[in-house]
A protein has these predicted regions:
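Eukaryotic polytopic
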Residues: 1-200
Length: 200
């Protein structure tokens, strides 16, 4: 009969992860809006980043897990999220080290944010190249998604009429738009990181 596969389980796992990321970015966007209203100085890009990420999450949740486009997109997305997780661990390590140093110097308390001064630290020499590498991969992934799925966008089939359930047009179009958003996110992250680096 049919071959046993982990794809439905893996695809469902990815969709659960995307649902969690959707919740995460929604809660962060709400929190940052409150912080801005209370006078925090948060770069406008990061607020926009979270709203764009919410849109990407919603798009990803609409894709059927058994489609070829989802399989193609899911592999790259998993690798990107693993890399993103490693960068978050590095950022946390860096921030904790900075805060520990500032507490030891008597410049901060445990509840302060570690980036209060503009002096560069040695941990940035590792953090920034890894961030740039992640952003380059995000741009590459967005470009690949656009190139491989642009044909589905150009196809007149299925825009105003019904198309067969076996067709992968809807998923391919979704992946195309996710690719566009990935490029926007990658470029925004890159320029925001450069602005932060120049400010230090």
């Amino acid at each position: 009969e049919g071959e046993a596969t982990l794809l439905p389980v893996l695809g469902s796992g990815i969709q659960l992860y995307v649902a969690w990321m959707l919740y995460f970015y929604t809660s962060v966007a709400l929190r940052e809006n409150v912080l801005v209203m209370n006078g925090s100085n948060i770069r406008a890009w990061w607020m926009q980043h979270h709203y764009i990420s919410i849109v990407v999450g919603l798009l990803m949740l609409t894709m059927p897990v058994e489609s070829d486009a989802f399989k193609h997109f899911g592999e790259g997305m998993l690798l990107f999220n693993i890399m993103q997780g490693l960068v978050m661990i590095l950022q946390t390590y860096y921030q904790r080290r900075r805060l520990y140093t500032r507490i030891a110097l008597g410049k901060s308390s445990k509840m302060d944010v570690a980036s209060a001064d503009s002096s560069a630290a040695s941990g940035q020499m590792l953090l920034f190249p890894v961030l740039f590498l992640l952003q380059a991969y995000q741009l590459y992934m967005g470009l690949i998604m656009i190139v491989y799925h642009a044909g589905a966008l150009a196809s007149p089939e299925g825009w105003l009429d019904e198309f067969p359930q076996s067709s992968d047009l809807r998923s391919s179009r979704t992946v195309f738009f996710c690719g566009v958003f990935f490029i926007v996110l990658g470029l925004g992250n890159f320029f925001s990181t450069l602005a932060t680096l120049n400010a230090k």
